[in-house]
Amino acid sequence: MVIQKNWQELIKPNKLQVTTGDDPKRVATVVAEPLERGFGTTLGNALRRVLLSSLQGAAVTSVQIDGVLHEFSSIPGVREDVTDIVLNIKTIAIRSQTDAPKRMTLRKTGPGLVTAGDIGTVGDIQILNPDLVICTLDDGAEIRMEFTVATGKGYVPAERNRPEDAPIGLIPVDSLFSPVTKVSYRVETTREGQDLDKDKLTMTVETNGAVSPEDALAYAARIIQDQLQVFVNFEDPRKEEAAPLAPQLPFNPALLKKVDELELSVRSANCLKNDNIVYIGDLIQKSEGEMLRTPNFGRKSLNEIKEVLAGMGLHLGMDIPGWPPENIEDLAKRFEEHY
């Protein structure tokens, strides 16, 4: 069909090369080629903007320091003034496994440096740059702080982090929630067969460690994909020409769908991935107790998954005869366009 030529005849990348440096959790370079001429800039710019603005992350939103009423203060025995301390607090890198606001506390007596690693965290919170210096204490000086940590996206100025019922002494902090710290891309010419006029896109992504560069790029691509879907006003003609279905299976073919297509939260999706749960059929055979024993998997994730499964007429703890089939990967591909 002519309509399909609009996208089927365009070249798609057949190579995706990922190169990591000394710290693969923070820096990676991804090369995609070949691309149609002009698509390198189109995709590179879109991915860069989404990476920097739209990924969820955690950050400190406010701090309370004993004996301090506002940020234009000084603390006896502390070399930095409160303004400098707040600037340092802004750069604390945090990984949070919960969407709910959390509190962290710090208490230390001098002399010596006060670092992010001195902060007492709860189980759902992890400090990713513990060597970050917050302030310096003289001999005999003491400091106590309480931090509020929340999740969000992009940059939120301090004034928007001040609650209406803020107590005296609460200092709101500018929050940079994005786990992505730097993105750059370049477009070069590459060849496809005898055609020397194709694009090669090279993207370098740096994160604070809360998410790997590869995952960050994948999340950004998914965001763009979801945003563009609303503009597609037709069904894929290929579905109309699909081959007849294979013989009837002893279970619901929808169980061959992969769990990463369920649009779960990042935390829930990562927990399933870490537990090697690939297909919906794998998931629904798990009991609630088994799921709650999964590392970093809490009640909120459980309720989210139960709600998604209920919408499909499924639930946890189901017994599925004939699961998993021996040729599960082949079956999943054959039923992909139908379910």
UniProtKB/Swiss-Prot annotation:
Record CDD domains: RNAP_alpha_NTD (cd06928)
Annotated keywords: DNA-directed RNA polymerase, Nucleotidyltransferase, Transcription, Transferase
Task: From the UniProt entry, list the residue stretches annotated as the region Alpha N-terminal domain (alpha-NTD).
Answer: 1-235
Gene Ontology terms, MF aspect: DNA binding; DNA-directed RNA polymerase activity; protein dimerization activity
One GO biological-process annotation of the entry reads:
DNA-templated transcription
Gene Ontology cellular-component terms listed? cytoplasm; DNA-directed RNA polymerase complex
Region feature Alpha C-terminal domain (alpha-CTD), mapped onto this chain: 251-339
- EC number(s) in its UniProt entry? 2.7.7.6
The domain of life for this entry's organism is Bacteria
Reaction(s) catalysed (UniProt annotation)? RNA(n) + a ribonucleoside 5'-triphosphate = RNA(n+1) + diphosphate
A Pfam family name for this chain? RNA_pol_A_CTD
Q: What is known of its domains?
A: The N-terminal domain is essential for RNAP assembly and basal transcription, whereas the C-terminal domain is involved in interaction with transcriptional regulators and with upstream promoter elements.
Q: What does this protein do?
A: DNA-dependent RNA polymerase catalyzes the transcription of DNA into RNA using the four ribonucleoside triphosphates as substrates.
Query: What does the record note on quaternary structure?
Result: Homodimer. The RNAP catalytic core consists of 2 alpha, 1 beta, 1 beta' and 1 omega subunit. When a sigma factor is associated with the core the holoenzyme is formed, which can initiate transcription.
Q: What HAMAP family would the database entry show? A: RNApol_bact_RpoA
**Family the entry assigns:** Belongs to the RNA polymerase alpha chain family.
Q: What is this protein called?
A: DNA-directed RNA polymerase subunit alpha
